Amino acid sequence: ANLLGHSLGGKAVMTFAISYPEKVEKLIVADIAPKAYPPHHQGIIKALQSVNFDEVKSRQDVENVLAQYIPEKFVIHFLTKNLYWTEDKKLNWRFNINTLAEKYNDFVANAIKFGKFEGETLFLAGAKSNYILPQDELLMRQQFPKYQLVSIADAGHWLQAENPKDFNQAVNEFLT
């Protein structure tokens, strides 16, 4: 399989690829390196937890709740792509927000400490982001020796939302 993960999802796919290399053909990691990071998305997690799905009736209602915590509309739109309608006709998150909140600090605060993935790997970095720094390439090379690094112009950490054209082009070129 080909795997793609952004940020925390990037850490997850790196860990999976190292743990189960026989299951991964190509790996794409968006705007995160295999290093430890200080936790700094607590505001977003708090916003996601603040949505009361017994009270909201529409995606717009959810966006209004998130807007109380998150000033960037494109981030809100990106996050609400993770909504779905349950069988009892209520909105909910596709992910377990309580587990994410509980484990988030442990996961981001730790580097990917073990192993190596020998398959082709694409790291995508937002040109305006500081998540992947030049000194991170040593770790990337050690654990993902067949890596390439592509910078996505005019994009910060939310590169797939800020510049989807260049993001998708880089992904498609890598996969073909």
Located regions from the model:
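Short alpha-helical segment within the catalytic ATP-binding CA
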Residues: S7, K11-A12, W158
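Conserved serine/cysteine hydrolase catalytic core
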Residues: E87-Q143, Q148-S151
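Alpha/beta-hydrolase fold nucleophile elbow
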Residues: A1-S7
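Core-facing hydrophobic residues within beta-strands of well-ordered domains
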Residues: V24, A36, F144-Y147, A155
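Conserved alpha/beta-hydrolase catalytic His-Asp/Glu region
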Residues: P39, D54-V108
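Catalytic active-site module of serine/aspartate enzymes centered on a nucleophile-bearing elbow/loop
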Residues: Y147-T176
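Flexible "cap/lid" loop of the alpha/beta hydrolase fold
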Residues: M14-S19, K23-K57
